[in-house]
């Protein structure tokens, strides 16, 4: 509900602040006093189109602040739009002389569109030139379903519709992408089979690179051993030693040559031992020569696979896992396509059964609502008005396949047409009041504003309007701009607007009236500028004093 409204430099207003109450709040004032300025200020703040010249003459800016109470629906809206809820809701609009408007929710800058979305959660407006939201097609459907307690049926239908559409969408995607899905399955099947067979481990590339470097160093040692063996296996070495030994043997046991003979024998033995050791080393290198070749082949293969799939070698394992997962998903999509088709048929059948059931209920409820509204309209001096609810079939939606149109005629002999096209502002407001009275505690917004709902009525009819407004105010805050004392007399809060003509400017002031001031204002509304004893007495009676 509206908690307070503050306005500065707005049209004819210098500065004012109003605090609102629960229940019925009426706004009165002489014709031309500027009652519509308050409504303009509210619409300006909440992002709706208003007069272009809203900044008071001589000022650089205009600003309107409104404080609202909160409910869970509004809190959820704020959270969904990343605005931190506070104890109260603070909205603001600032317009500077250059024409730019800035909107704020809880001191956070927001767009005009978001402010307008928020407004739909805060209040309804019904008046001469404004009927916000209630005459939209979806709202008329909500009125009918709320009146007939059909919202649970509609929710079940909506759930079925969403499931049906999701299944259709999934089927369409599979059909559209059938070829590409099959191609991707082929690709992933080959890739996963290849990678599984290779079984490349994390860190394997680095280990193989280090091993290759080590083996390449050993390869150099192998070549050295081969070169040495080639040298010491030279036959001339053995021949030379044998010749030397034979020459010494001819000398007999000559002590002078014994040491030389021993050295030659040792040289021969050492040479044989070196040959054996070199042969053993050579034999041990045969395996490692093979291992180097195998290592290089494995390393080359890993690098080639990494380039092929454009994935780092260490990430090939993760790539394999993801590919297997995606392959499973795609195979399931193909396998489930027939199942989805059967499911789609069942959901479609269920939807039309539920929609048909809901349509039948709506037709019954529509007749009851028409009758209820006719009775209300009689009380509001619109006995000859016609109200009809036309229901036609349309394409399936989450809310059913019914096209619901509220139609009316306010003139005898005139065919009923869409309600917002045939009714005047005052008549339309009374239609809305009749609807609200019929619905009463259903579809209640935190606040409802009626702008001059009582145009063209008086006396008993005005009293009936006041009674219904009072009843409605027991479940929501009702703000009424009125000329009728019968309506104003039922207020919980009475606000008076006055326009004062000064020497150089015109000012508008706003005041919440006490009981004595209310009696005087009601008397003025009854008799005009000249307040009489009779009008004061009548005002006293309206206030039940």
Curated annotation (Swiss-Prot):
CDD domains: ABC_RecN. Keywords: ATP-binding, DNA damage, DNA repair, Nucleotide-binding. ATP binds at residues 29-36. The keyword DNA repair applies. GO terms for biological process: DNA recombination; DNA repair; SOS response. The keyword Chloroplast does not apply. Belongs to the RecN family. This is DNA repair protein RecN. It comes from Rickettsia conorii (strain ATCC VR-613 / Malish 7). The gene is recN.
């Amino acid at each position: 509900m509206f908690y307070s409204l503050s306005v500065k430099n707005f049209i004819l207003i210098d500065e004012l602040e109003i605090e609102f109450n629960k229940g019925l709040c009426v706004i009165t004032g002489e014709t031309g006093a500027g009652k519509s300025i308050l409504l303009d200020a509210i619409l300006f703040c909440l992002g709706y189109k208003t007069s272009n010249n809203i900044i008071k003459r001589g000022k650089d800016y205009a600003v309107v602040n409104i404080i609202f109470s909160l409910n869970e629906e509004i809190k959820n809206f704020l959270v969904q739009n990343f605005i931190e809820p506070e104890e109260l809701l603070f909205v603001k609009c600032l317009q500077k002389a250059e024409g730019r408007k800035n909107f704020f929710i809880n001191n956070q800058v927001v767009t005009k569109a978001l402010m307008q979305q928020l407004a739909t959660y805060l209040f309804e407006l019904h008046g001469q030139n404004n009927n916000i939201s209630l005459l939209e097609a979806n709202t008329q459907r909500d009125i009918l379903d709320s009146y007939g307690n059909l919202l649970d049926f509609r929710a079940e239908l909506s759930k079925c519709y969403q499931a049906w559409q999701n299944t259709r969408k999934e089927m369409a995607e599979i059909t559209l992408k059938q070829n590409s899905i099959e191609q991707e399955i082929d690709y992933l099947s080959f890739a996963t089979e290849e990678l599984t067979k290779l079984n490349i481990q994390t860190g394997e590339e680095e280990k193989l690179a280090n091993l290759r470097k080590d083996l390449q160093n050993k390869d150099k040692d192998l070549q050295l051993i081969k070169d040495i063996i080639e040298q010491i296996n030279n036959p001339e070495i053995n021949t030379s030693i044998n010749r030397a030994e034979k020459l010494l043997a001819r000398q007999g046991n000559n002590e002078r040559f014994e040491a030389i003979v021993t050295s030659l024998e040792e040289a021969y033995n050492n040479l044989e031992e070196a040959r054996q050791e070199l042969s053993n080393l050579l034999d041990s290198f045969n395996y490692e020569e093979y291992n180097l070749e195998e290592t290089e082949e494995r390393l080359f293969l890993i690098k080639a696979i990494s380039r092929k799939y454009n994935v780092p070698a260490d990430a090939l394992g993760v790539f394999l896992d993801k590919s297997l997962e995606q392959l499973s998903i795609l195979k399931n999509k193909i396998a489930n396509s027939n199942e989805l088709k059967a499911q789609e048929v069942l959901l479609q059948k269920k939807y039309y059964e539920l929609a048909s059931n809901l349509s039948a209920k709506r037709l019954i409820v529509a007749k009851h609502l028409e009758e209820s509204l006719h009775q209300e309209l009689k009380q509001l001096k619109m006995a000859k008005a016609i109200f009809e609810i036309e229901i036609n079939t349309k394409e399936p939606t989450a809310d059913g396949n019914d096209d619901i149109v509220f139609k009316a005629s306010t003139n005898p002999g005139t065919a009923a047409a869409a309600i917002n096209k045939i009714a005047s502002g005052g008549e339309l407001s009374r239609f809305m009041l009749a609807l609200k009275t019929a619905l009463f505690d259903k579809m209640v917004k935190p606040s409802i504003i009626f702008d001059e709902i009582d145009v063209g009525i008086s006396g008993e009819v005005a009293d009936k309007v006041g009674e219904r407004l009072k009843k409605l105010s027991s479940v929501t805050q009702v703000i009424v701009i009125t000329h009728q004392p019968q309506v104003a007399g039922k207020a919980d809060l009475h606000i008076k607007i006055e326009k004062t003509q000064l020497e150089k400017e015109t000012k508008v002031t706003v005041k919440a009236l006490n009981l004595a001031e209310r009696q005087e204002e009601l008397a003025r509304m009854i008799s005009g500028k000249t307040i009489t004893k009779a009008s004061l007495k009548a005002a006293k009676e309206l206030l039940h004093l």
